[in-house]
């Protein structure tokens, strides 16, 4: 179990460093900013690369919502859920701390949103709480459906990380304007701790919505995809 938790810690750490790091450090860098498209691909690439790297050790969740959805679908033992979530949140916090140290090394650095998730006046596009809630539930739901389907034993081996990485990229392309895209409570927690204030007060949504969407996906998969469940 220790090796699995280390893998989840490292994977989540890389996701936040690569994804949130691109948003904080490179999204609007003078003249060569990567923009929304670049940030979206950065998040997808972090999952793709780490899924190939440590997926064989822990399953490559890097996300409390993914762990919950897989547990509800019967893919992983529920007993490991709490340990996985702790490792994931710890990885996200450490990565956010490293990113903060790097970002504050710039003379004119301003914290701003620090890639934190938000709704209302803290939504990149000014979207309401309801819009943010629906977006996070729906996007996490489909993210889990894609994960559950692409990791099935009847699907050609070795391609799941590609499908999952591209799915996360697409999710970010759609939802960055709405919430700055969470679908991952650990990723949201790490950034919110350093922003404080409004980010912490709105953090509840970025736990409840992804976990709810993931749980529904697990239930749906057990019903719709029951015949395709892999052999343990």
Curated annotation (Swiss-Prot):
The chain crosses the membrane at residues 9-29, 32-52, 82-102, 129-149, 158-178, 200-220. One of its GO terms (cellular component) is plasma membrane. A motif (NPA 2) lies at residues 184-186. The keyword Repeat applies. It is a multi-pass membrane protein. It catalyses: H2O(in) = H2O(out). The record marks 20 as: Involved in tetramerization or stability of the tetramer. It holds the Pfam family MIP. GO terms for molecular function: water channel activity. It is found in: Cell inner membrane. NCBIfam families: MIP (TIGR00861), PRK05420.1 (NF003838). Channel that permits osmotically driven movement of water in both directions. It is involved in the osmoregulation and in the maintenance of cell turgor during volume expansion in rapidly growing cells. It mediates rapid entry or exit of water in response to abrupt changes in osmolarity. Homotetramer. This is Aquaporin Z 2. It comes from Rhizobium meliloti (strain 1021). The gene is aqpZ2.
